[in-house]
Curated annotation (Swiss-Prot):
Functional note: NDH shuttles electrons from NAD(P)H:plastoquinone, via FMN and iron-sulfur (Fe-S) centers, to quinones in the photosynthetic chain and possibly in a chloroplast respiratory chain. The immediate electron acceptor for the enzyme in this species is believed to be plastoquinone. Couples the redox reaction to proton translocation, and thus conserves the redox energy in a proton gradient.
InterPro entries documented for this protein: NAD(P)H_OxRDtase_bac/plastid, NADH_UbQ/plastoQ_OxRdtase_su3, NDAH_ubi_oxred_su3_sf
HAMAP family, sorted: NDH1_NuoA
UniProt entry tagged with the keyword Transport: yes
Source organism per UniProt: Huperzia lucidula (Shining clubmoss)
Binding partners and assembly: NDH is composed of at least 16 different subunits, 5 of which are encoded in the nucleus.
One Pfam family this sequence matches: Oxidored_q4
UniProt record, GO biological process: photosynthesis, light reaction
Protein name: NAD(P)H-quinone oxidoreductase subunit 3, chloroplastic
Membrane topology: Multi-pass membrane protein
EC number: 7.1.1.-
Length: 120
C-alpha cells in the first residue's frame, strides 16, 4: 500500500512555487521586445504629452500621516485574532492586548502634543 506523508503535498507545492519566479523571469526578459530611445525616459500620461517633470517632492508631513496610518492598520490587524478568541484566552490575554493598544495611543498623544499632526 502506498502511504503519503501528511506534508508531502505541502513540500511539493513549496518547491513548485519557489521554482516559478526564477524560471518565469528569464523567460519574460528574453521574449519581451526591448525598445531603446528617448521616449523610454518620459513619463506616460495616457497618451498625452507629459507636462512638467515626473519627479516632484512631497512634503514630509505626507509621510508622517502615512506612517501613522500604517502603524494603526498593523495594530488593528494584530488585534483581530485576539478579538476572535477573547472568551478562550481570558484575563492574561486581555492585559497583553490592553498594553499593546496603550503603547500606540500614548505615542499618538505624544506626537499630537509635539505638533506632528499640524500641517504647516
Amino acid at each position: 500500500m502506498f502511504l503519503i506523508s501528511k506534508y508531502n503535498y505541502f513540500w511539493l507545492f513549496l518547491l513548485l512555487a519557489s521554482l516559478i519566479p526564477p524560471v518565469a523571469s528569464p523567460i519574460s526578459s528574453y521574449s519581451a521586445p526591448v525598445g531603446k530611445g528617448p521616449e523610454k525616459f518620459t513619463s506616460y500620461e495616457s497618451g498625452i504629452e507629459p507636462i512638467g517633470d515626473a519627479w516632484i517632492q512631497f512634503q514630509i508631513r505626507y509621510y508622517m500621516f502615512a506612517s501613522v496610518f500604517v502603524i494603526s492598520d498593523a495594530e488593528t490587524v494584530s488585534l483581530y485574532p485576539w478579538a476572535m478568541c477573547f472568551n478562550e484566552l481570558g484575563v492574561p490575554a486581555s492585559a497583553e492586548a490592553s498594553i499593546s493598544v496603550t503603547i500606540p495611543i500614548v505615542g499618538s498623544v505624544y506626537a499630537w502634543r509635539r505638533g506632528a499632526s499640524e500641517w504647516s
